[in-house]
Amino acid sequence: MDDLQSQNLSMDMTDSPPTLANNRLENRMAQLITTEAWNINSTDLVKKALVTVPAPSILNPPAESQSGMALKVAATVLQPLCLGESPVVMPIHMQVEGSSAPELNPNGNATYVMTTQGPVQLPVVLEQHVFQHLNSPLVLPQEAPCSSNAIHNNLFQGAEDSEAQPQLLDLRIPSQPQEPALPFEAVLQNLFPTQGSLGPPPCQPPPGYAPVPPQPFNSPLSPLVPPATLLVPYPVIVPLPVPVPIPIPVPVPQSTESKFSPTFPKPPSSFGLHSFKGTQTTLEKDELKPLDILQSKEYFQLSRHTVIKMGSENEALDLSMKSVPWLKAGEASPPVFQEDAALDLSLAAHRKAEAPPETLYNNSGSADIQGHTILEKLSSGMEMPFAPAKCSEASAMMESHSSNSNGTEMVSQPSHPGSELKAENNIEILSESQAAKVIVSVEDAVPAIFCGKIKGLSGVSTKNFSFKREDSVLQGYDINSQGEESLGNAEPLRKPIKNRSIKLKKVNSQEIHMLPIKKQRLATFFPRK
């Protein structure tokens, strides 16, 4: 190296370093990129890097800068470099301790390299992204971060000393014919003609030094689109579960009048308990013994409408209202009714109907034949639709229906003595079916539904089963109402009813055993009998 410096010392004194660099560039412009550049050995490149230093393109006094663009120096940090109108991020890898940042020479006298995109100046020497852009298979090793501390000191002493620049240039000039990678000394000169003074790293990495492989977007020669590996894989949007308010029905407090049945409105006052008792008392005391057909029809209409209204509006209150006429009808005086009120409420488990009032008429009027005839007419009239008929029409229809109903009763229940018992049973059956249509209560209506299933499955006829079921359910009412009567002719009437009820209980139990599947479901209703 001393020989090289001594040979070229006189020429360095006469010619300026940019002039020598331009001469070398013009002489070897055709030989910049040869086959040796692609097949160069990495070890030779490192050895030559210790000698080759791009002095003209990198090291110049700060006074010669023309204030174009500045690059701040930082170690291992990517610094933005404004080139033209678009900022370009260029890697800065080296930093020399205790030295100020020298600046580039923007006068265009740096060396050029011919690439596929035209002549390019190389202010940053041999970065790996340049080779990637030029499709070079050369992989530079990451050795020799800088040549040595002595080289750095010589470089920056030469920047201050007038004789140091020719020395550094002499180091580069003789090795240029042997350096195949030297054409990459000046990059981006033609691409960025408005390049001003740059603050490059104090120690620019030699051609043999390859820093950490920069990302493709760091290079101004690389495509503008970043690689897919640098993009965010996918935006993660996790919808959080938002609690949806669910409306919960809050029961509205009912008034004292309708507290028994919160789902139905209160019944009208015309069908209240008081008015019903007063009407029944008047019918019983005034014209119960003569038992006129007109009075019977009026009472039938009253009881029918009352039952329908109560069944559709207020179920819980319906039980108490229907039980009052029965007990009051079964007894002879109001004080006895006071005692039996509790008994009637206890028997509320049975299915109730408006039959006991008619049974009352039958029992109280059984002394004479006229009472039984009128009762038969009334019972047969209950089979008809609930249209109020005149006295003459009602009597005619009732007589015709009574004969048919009596014949049916004899067939289904041959053990009953007399037409009066048949008429009474017919009244009970019809009133029971009528109450079932109205649905007296939830407690009383459910057994009727299950009994209908049993009736259809067990093979029992509809007529026979309806009679048996109603007689067995109403046996308590028949016995109680008849036992309280003061008439002597009711005794022979009560005994057949009692025997018949016991017999029909057995039949019902047999029918239940015929269906073991339904027996367990009906167990909650029948033990109350």
Curated annotation (Swiss-Prot):
Region Disordered: start and end of each range? Answer: 1-21, 400-419
Provide the protein name: Retinoic acid-induced protein 2
Supply the induction statement.
Answer: By retinoic acid.
Task: State the encoding gene.
Answer: Rai2
Segments forming a coiled coil: none
Extent of Polar residues compositional bias: 407-416
